[in-house]
């Protein structure tokens, strides 16, 4: 038996075939073309071929721990982080205490999430790295991770001495996005309900994830205490106070976690739109000014700044000071000026 080819996964017995295929099988058997009663299914004809390129990720072994300058997490969030990460009392070196990729939950829900096999080693290491980041930047009110997927990818990517991401070793956004989408299918993460389309930049607005109760249970936190702490922070949250000021809520009314999370995401989307609009306007202004000579650039920028200064500040602003502001603004737009900046 050891020498036989294992065809139990892709071959079927002739009796399980359709009547027409059974007739064709016995014709082949009598003609000597069939030598076994197990029939392999006909493979689909496709032009797809395995390429010669490498499929290994740029960053095979990512690592991230909460920096010392960060304030320690309080309550059950701190308990969850301490269950994930341990610190050597002698050397102060941090390392993983719990590998989330080996949690039995992923084995139990494997079929439910659409997987057949366990995680590959490179995905295990990425999953072990991302969970401390998710807990570390989780909001105590909504349990929403305060970073978009692209910012999370930059956070865990290796950086050089200047703090910039090394392109050859980065954790790509697409790789992390696929991992988080799979965690959503497992039910341990939730994702923002809708992703708005920005017509100006032809890009979607950032997506945010939040840790579900199933995710917190995996981390081993006290769910009763976690709920009590969340409700307390929810009553004191700026989102609730803002709704009270707008007249949407009364002083004695509480806001649900779902409503607070939706309000939080709406605010983040508006902030992203404002930032993109300002960036697009600055880029358009830079392209227009780049065609002008240096002195004309300074004049145009000075007039632009004069119109946007507060009235009291514009009244006392001298031409020399306005010129310095214009040159500084032009250099921020990365325009090359012939004259050096004034000292």
Curated annotation (Swiss-Prot):
Keyword field contains Aminoacyl-tRNA synthetase: no
Segments forming a coiled coil: none
GO biological process, any: plasmid maintenance
InterPro entries, per database record: Plasmid_replication_init_RepA
Record region (Disordered): 42-61
Assigned keywords, A-Z: DNA replication, Plasmid
Entry keyword annotation includes Nucleus: no
Protein known as: Replication initiation protein
Annotated gene: repA
């Amino acid at each position: 038996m050891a020498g036989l080819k294992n065809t139990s996964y892709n071959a079927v017995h002739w009796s399980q075939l359709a009547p027409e295929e059974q007739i064709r099988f016995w014709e082949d058997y009598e003609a000597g073309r069939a030598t076994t009663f197990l029939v392999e299914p006909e493979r689909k004809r496709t032009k797809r071929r395995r390429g010669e390129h490498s499929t290994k990720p740029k960053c095979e072994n990512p690592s991230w721990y909460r920096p010392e300058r960060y304030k320690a997490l309080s309550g059950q969030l701190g308990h969850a982080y301490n269950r994930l990460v341990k610190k050597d009392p002698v050397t102060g070196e941090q390392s993983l205490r719990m590998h989330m990729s080996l949690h039995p939950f992923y084995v139990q829900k494997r079929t439910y999430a659409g997987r057949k096999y366990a995680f590959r080693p490179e995905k295990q290491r990425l999953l072990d790295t991302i969970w401390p980041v998710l807990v570390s930047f989780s909001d105590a009110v909504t349990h929403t991770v305060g970073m978009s997927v692209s910012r999370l990818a930059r956070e865990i990517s290796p950086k050089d001495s200047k703090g910039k991401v090394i392109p050859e070793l980065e954790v790509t956004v697409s790789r992390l996005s696929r991992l988080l989408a799979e965690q959503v299918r497992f039910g341990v993460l939730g994702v923002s309900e809708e992703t708005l389309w920005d017509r100006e930049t032809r890009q979607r607005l950032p997506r945010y994830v939040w840790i579900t109760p199933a995710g917190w249970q995996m981390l081993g936190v006290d769910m009763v205490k976690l709920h009590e702490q969340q409700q307390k922070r929810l009553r004191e949250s700026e989102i609730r106070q803002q709704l009270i000021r707008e007249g949407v809520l009364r002083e004695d009314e509480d806001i649900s976690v779902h409503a607070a999370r939706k309000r939080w995401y709406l605010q983040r989307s508006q902030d992203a739109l404002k930032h993109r609009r300002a960036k697009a306007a600055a880029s358009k202004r830079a392209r227009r000014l780049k065609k002008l000579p240096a002195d004309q650039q300074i004049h145009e920028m000075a007039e632009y700044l004069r119109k946007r200064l507060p009235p009291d500040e514009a009244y006392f602003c001298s031409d020399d000071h306005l010129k310095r502001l214009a040159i500084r603004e032009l250099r921020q737009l990365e325009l090359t000026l012939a004259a050096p900046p004034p000292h």
